[in-house]
């Protein structure tokens, strides 16, 4: 049986090596049916994972990666987890993807894979609205020595959002201030606005005005957050008794803003409020 086992497997592997995926799939499945506990069953499940990936057959990936993970310390576990977690994430099974990324983090044998796992954990936690998990995951990722600026921004942004929801406003502000240093990306564009909003909420109107005027001068390709900043600046002027300035900023924004979103209604409600009060 042992010789038969290895011969049957070797034949299937040869077909896979030639790139004949459909044929290899049939042969590998046949091998697993004939030798369910065969000496090469892990290899067969691994190749079937790869074929599933090649053919975008996601059920196949989940099935065979699941079989591989029944043997926790097998040499294919890391790659199986990478494929498995990606499928679960794309199918929006966030809790399952989170579990897979956590396993991957424990098993990761190099920095790239550890970072991939930490990024996955962060995104799943954020989408699951699990603030504590998000904060931990972002902090782990931010501790990585070689982190791309894009991932660093993403981690800071998710952590700031989670801190805000947990009422840790001071910590959220630290992350937003860090992000606000570069308003060219969407995270920084929103962060600069959030910093000013927080100053406004604290009734620090002079500081809020300074932050907003600085933002308007700096500008950003993200028109929505710049428009929100104009609206907030009008709120600052209204709060400090400069209704004429408030009205002017709103009218100028109304004429120049093209976006089809909630900005228009923000302008309208403020203009009618100014009309009633004056």
Regions found by a protein language model. Name each.
Residues 1-278:
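Acidic, polar-rich low-complexity tracts and alpha-helical solenoid repeat scaffolds
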């Amino acid at each position: 049986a042992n010789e038969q086992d290895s011969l049957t497997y070797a034949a299937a592997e040869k077909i896979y090596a030639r790139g004949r995926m459909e044929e290899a799939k049939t042969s590998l499945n046949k091998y697993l049916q004939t030798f369910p506990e065969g000496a090469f069953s892990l290899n067969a499940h691994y190749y079937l994972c790869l074929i599933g990936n090649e053919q975008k057959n996601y059920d196949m990936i989940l099935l065979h990666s699941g079989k591989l993970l029944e043997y926790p310390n097998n040499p294919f576990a890391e790659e199986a987890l990478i494929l498995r977690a990606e499928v679960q994430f794309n199918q929006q099974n966030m809790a399952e993807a989170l579990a897979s990324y956590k396993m991957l983090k424990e098993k990761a044998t190099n920095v790239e894979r550890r970072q991939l796992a930490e990024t996955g954990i962060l995104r799943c936690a954020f989408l699951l609205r699990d603030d504590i998990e998000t904060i931990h995951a972002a902090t782990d990722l931010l501790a990585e020595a070689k982190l791309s600026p894009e991932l660093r921004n993403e981690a800071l942004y998710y952590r700031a959002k989670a801190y805000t929801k947990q009422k840790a406003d001071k910590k959220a502000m630290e992350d937003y201030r860090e992000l606000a240093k570069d308003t060219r990306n969407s995270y920084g564009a929103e962060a600069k606005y959030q910093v000013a909003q927080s100053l406004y909420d604290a009734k620090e109107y002079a500081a809020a005005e300074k932050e907003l005027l600085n933002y308007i001068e700096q500008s950003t390709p993200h028109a929505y957050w710049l428009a929100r900043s104009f609206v907030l600046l009008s709120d600052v002027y209204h709060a400090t008794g400069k209704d004429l300035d408030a009205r002017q900023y709103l009218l100028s924004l109304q004429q120049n803003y093209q976006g089809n979103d909630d900005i228009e209604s923000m302008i309208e409600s403020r203009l009618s409020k100014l009309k009633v009060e004056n």
